Amino acid sequence: MAKLLPRIGSRKNGRISSRKNARKIPKGVIHVQASFNNTIVTVTDVRGRVISWSSAGACGFRGTRRGTPFAAQTAAGNAIRTVVDQGMQRAEVMIKGPGLGRDAALRAIRRSGILLSFVRDVTPMPHNGCRPPKKRRV
């Protein structure tokens, strides 16, 4: 009979999650990726290790409602609530993408009480790279 080995990153093994929660993070980076279909908010420390994340889909929005500004606001609030409890006071914000949730997510971040050192738009812009997809005909 084979012996069951505990998986290192499993939910049952509480060692990793408890170590994550024990860290005090005074400064971090908030990444907002706003597409037309969804908004993903990831909070990392300065070295880039993920502390918390949320998305409109993970907050319970489905279908076309995931791309709305209210869904982005909810996702940003959920992602930031955990890091504020861990003691984050200052953050940099990196916003990527053309979606409707850009401004709503930024508004939710401002309201959370975290001091923003800077807000940067890191949307990738091609220097005449790949050919874009053909126009939709509805």
UniProtKB/Swiss-Prot annotation:
Transmembrane parts of this sequence: none
GO molecular function: rRNA binding; structural constituent of ribosome
Compartment list: Plastid, Chloroplast
Chain residue ranges for the region called Disordered: 1-22
Superkingdom of the source species: Eukaryota
GO cellular component, one term: ribosome
Matching Pfam families: Ribosomal_S11
Keywords attached to this entry: Chloroplast, Plastid, Ribonucleoprotein, Ribosomal protein, RNA-binding, rRNA-binding
GO biological process: translation
Basic residues composition-biased segments: 9-22
Oligomeric form and interacting partners: Part of the 30S ribosomal subunit.
Similarity comment: Belongs to the universal ribosomal protein uS11 family.
PANTHER family (UniProt xref): 40S RIBOSOMAL PROTEIN S14/30S RIBOSOMAL PROTEIN S11
Protein name as annotated: Small ribosomal subunit protein uS11c
Annotated source species: Populus trichocarpa (Western balsam poplar)
Organism ancestry: Eukaryota, Viridiplantae, Streptophyta, Embryophyta, Tracheophyta
Gene transcribed to yield this protein: rps11
